[in-house]
């Protein structure tokens, strides 16, 4: 386990589920988990997609909440992005997963620090 990773499960019931999108967005934005679920359902209805798919959370983050996407250089890892923003809250996307970095520490249910990142959003 890396020093810049901390286990954190934002789900109110504590279950380990495949809901990284809701967990990460709720953690980063500090919106209630249930509020993020509702926003994702609305986004899914508008985009006619699953609430956890990329187009759905991209729409929520960029079009509804107004966060600007930033694209990674090809060799950047989650740890690299977290280290680049040690005083910020950042949502980081990897293939099939969305995670949150807060003050340089990855908050997630698994250590994805060495995974290659392709896109991120600075939240605060």
Regions found by a protein language model. Give the residues of each.
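Conserved active-site-adjacent core of cysteine acyl-enzyme catalytic domains
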Residues: 44-96, 102-111, 116, 121
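Active-site nucleophile-adjacent alpha helix/oxyanion-hole segment immediately C-terminal to the catalytic cysteine
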Residues: 1-66
């Amino acid at each position: 386990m890396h020093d810049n990773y901390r286990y954190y499960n934002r789900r109110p019931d504590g279950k380990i589920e495949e809901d990284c999108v809701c967990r990460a967005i709720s953690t980063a934005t500090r919106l209630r988990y249930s509020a993020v679920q509702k926003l994702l359902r609305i986004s899914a209805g508008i985009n006619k997609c699953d609430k956890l798919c990329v187009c759905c959370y991209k729409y929520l983050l960029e079009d509804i909440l107004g966060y600007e996407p930033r694209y990674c250089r090809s060799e950047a890892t989650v740890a690299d992005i977290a280290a680049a923003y040690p005083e910020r809250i950042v949502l980081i996307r990897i293939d099939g997963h969305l995670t949150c970095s807060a003050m340089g520490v990855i908050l997630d249910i698994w250590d994805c620090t060495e995974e290659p990142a392709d896109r991120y959003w600075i939240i605060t």
